[in-house]
Amino acid sequence: MRQRGFTLLEIMLVVLLAGVAATLVMMAIPAPKQQDSGWQIARFKAQLQYAVEDSQMNDHILGIYIQPHRWQYALLQRQVVENSPEEQQRLRYVWIPWQPYRMSVPSELPDSFHIELSTQVGAAGDGTGFSPGNGDPHVLILPGGEVTPFRLTLRNGNDSAWLQVDTNGQVHTSPEAEQKG
């Protein structure tokens, strides 16, 4: 009677060859880009450009909250205040997280990264009505295409990259980010 199937030795040989092939493929794949500050700045730039375009097309005000290891986009939305002391309805504006389907929000960075933000003094006007310390975002994106001038620097050990928006709304990046974008 003939035996059907494979012997244990044949099966083990196939598993060994598959493992070697998988190892060779993994060694050929480049290191993850998430650890590269230039790649992260290019990602932030793409998100910023999308937010500016969306703000212009949909006529709404957006903002960006910057924290040491993440950034979050927000939308300024009008709310009706119920039960106001007066008989008339009152309106107030609140910042809510903005999460378009095309953007991964919020943008978390690996723990080894650190974000530094500097804005121009007086960039937000005379200081009345806008204050990042009072819950307002650090960067404003207005429907006319205006963006609060700022400089964002990402550091990952000795690796760093920056993005700067000037008073004319032009976006400039470090050479590391331009190569990635």
UniProtKB/Swiss-Prot annotation:
Function of the protein: Component of the type II secretion system required for the energy-dependent secretion of extracellular factors such as proteases and toxins from the periplasm. Part of the pseudopilus tip complex that is critical for the recognition and binding of secretion substrates.
Locate the N-methylphenylalanine modifications and list their residues. Answer: F6
Instruction: Give the originating organism.
Output: Dickeya chrysanthemi
Q: What is the lineage of its organism?
A: Bacteria, Pseudomonadati, Pseudomonadota, Gammaproteobacteria, Enterobacterales
One of the Pfam families matching this protein, by short name: N_methyl
Q: What is this protein called?
A: Type II secretion system protein H
- How does this chain sit within the bilayer? Single-pass membrane protein
Give disulfide pairs as residue numbers.
none
Q: Propeptide ranges, please?
A: 1-5
Gene Ontology BP annotations: protein secretion by the type II secretion system
